Amino acid sequence: MFKDFDFSKMGEMLSEAQKKAAEFENEIAAKEFVAKSGGGLISVKANGRSQILDISIDDTLLEDKESLQILLISAINDAIKLSEDEKKRAASAMFGGLGGFGV
């Protein structure tokens, strides 16, 4: 299973993985994602840590609480999903080459 793996390089590989993880965290945290619902009546901005940064609500929705709630939930969930999907994509691209275990 590990016939071609050089265990003497394990510390070096771990150090490289930690460095890449720190770079990944900084890069993803700086990204922003915008999701809209209700044809753009609600806009939600999230960062790469899935934290909501901004919410914009069109004044026409202020009289319709039920619609506002539904559209707001939808936009927030979409913004978080965009952030999570990007984290998965970026992690796969960044850490995909760390295999090296010969398995």
Swiss-Prot record:
Q: Does the keyword GTP-binding apply?
A: no
User: What is the official name of this protein in its record?
Assistant: Nucleoid-associated protein CFF8240_0066
Pfam annotation, one family: YbaB_DNA_bd
Q: Which NCBIfam families match?
A: DNA_YbaB_EbfC (TIGR00103)
Q: What are the alphabetically sorted keywords of the record?
A: Cytoplasm, DNA-binding
- SUPFAM superfamilies named in the record: YbaB-like
Listed GO molecular functions? Answer: DNA binding
Q: Which GO terms describe its cellular component?
A: bacterial nucleoid; cytosol
Query: Which residues, if any, are the signal sequence?
Result: none
Please name the source species: Campylobacter fetus subsp. fetus (strain 82-40)
